């Protein structure tokens, strides 16, 4: 039983990124212009984008800090603009 507990703890730590952070950026079909952040799995950093206001997914954060905290990213430079 202890072995299983250790196995799952190691597996959880080694996986690292929250599954929501691996979702693609979705601007959505609506035409609002909300500045948001998403985790870009290619660049491995949080980047700014303009969210339309509807039809998004969980990879959509109000602040850079929230994105970095949830997705386990350390801030490097200012975010890329998209």
Curated annotation (Swiss-Prot):
Disulfide bonds join 21-71, 30-54, 46-67. Its main location: secreted. It comes from Anemonia viridis (Snakelocks anemone). Belongs to the venom Kunitz-type family. Sea anemone type 2 potassium channel toxin subfamily. It holds the Pfam family Kunitz_BPTI. PROSITE patterns: BPTI_KUNITZ_1 (PS00280), BPTI_KUNITZ_2 (PS50279). Residues 1-16 form the signal peptide. It is found in: Secreted; Nematocyst. Serine protease inhibitor that inhibits both tissue and plasma kallikreins. Has hemolytic activity. Inhibits voltage-gated potassium channels (Kv). Residues 76-82 form a propeptide. One of its GO terms (cellular component) is extracellular region. Residues 21-71 form the BPTI/Kunitz inhibitor domain. GO terms for molecular function: serine-type endopeptidase inhibitor activity. This is KappaPI-actitoxin-Avd3e. The record marks 31-32 as: Reactive bond. Keywords: Disulfide bond, Nematocyst, Protease inhibitor, Secreted, Serine protease inhibitor, Signal.
């Amino acid at each position: 039983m202890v072995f299983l507990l250790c196995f799952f703890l190691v597996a959880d730590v080694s996986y690292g990124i929250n599954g929501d952070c691996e979702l693609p950026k979705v601007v959505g079909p609506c035409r609002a212009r909300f500045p948001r952040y998403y985790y870009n799995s290619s660049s491995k950093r949080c980047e700014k984008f303009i969210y339309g206001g509807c039809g998004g997914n969980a990879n959509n954060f109000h602040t850079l800090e929230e994105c970095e905290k949830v997705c386990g990213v350390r801030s490097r430079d200012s975010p890329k603009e998209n």
